[in-house]
């Protein structure tokens, strides 16, 4: 079943996400789960277009997904079903995606870290507008007890999975 789905995605992935009409309310999303190595069906609500990405909301958890047009593998059908998976980038690519956004404004995001089978920890960060990478480090502000503290973060410390909020 999942291999058939993958062939369907590959055959149709060049369709533009902009084909989704603004009045679209709900859609099915087949999301690739990297931990379990298979696709699982998730229900998302399409919220809006913003800059160079689209915003979806998970109907069960209210978690928001920010999906870049250029990176979304998708299929849009008459039944308003999007068969896709959200790509988990390599660490350095995550950072440059964020830097692309901070040209115009501050960006707040969190990193969910689940390395070496340890329990997940959630770290909140903010990157200021027009931030640049210098000597493989970037100036970030991490949130602790509702306050932000300045810190330098190596671009190689970014994990594979990252969510912008």
Which ranges hold each PLM region?
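Mixed-charge, Lys/Arg-rich low-complexity intrinsically disordered regions
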Residues: 2-25, 84-101
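Basic/aromatic-rich interaction segments and small domains that mediate binding to polyanionic partners
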Residues: 38-66, 129-149
């Amino acid at each position: 079943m999942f291999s058939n789905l993958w062939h369907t995605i590959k055959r149709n992935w060049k369709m533009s996400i902009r084909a989704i009409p603004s009045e679209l309310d709900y859609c099915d999303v087949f999301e690739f789960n990297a931990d379990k190595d298979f696709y699982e069906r998730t229900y998302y609500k399409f919220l809006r277009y913003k800059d160079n990405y689209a915003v979806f909301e998970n109907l069960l958890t209210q978690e928001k997904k920010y999906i870049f047009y250029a990176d979304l593998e998708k299929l849009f059908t008459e039944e308003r079903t999007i068969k896709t998976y959200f790509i988990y980038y390599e660490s350095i690519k995550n950072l440059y995606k964020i830097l692309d956004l901070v040209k115009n404004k501050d960006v707040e995001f969190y990193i969910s870290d689940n390395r070496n089978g340890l329990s997940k920890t959630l770290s909140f960060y903010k990157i200021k507008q027009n931030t640049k990478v210098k000597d493989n480090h970037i100036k970030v502000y991490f949130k602790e007890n509702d306050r932000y503290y300045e810190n330098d973060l190596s671009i190689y410390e970014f994990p594979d999975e990252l969510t912008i909020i």
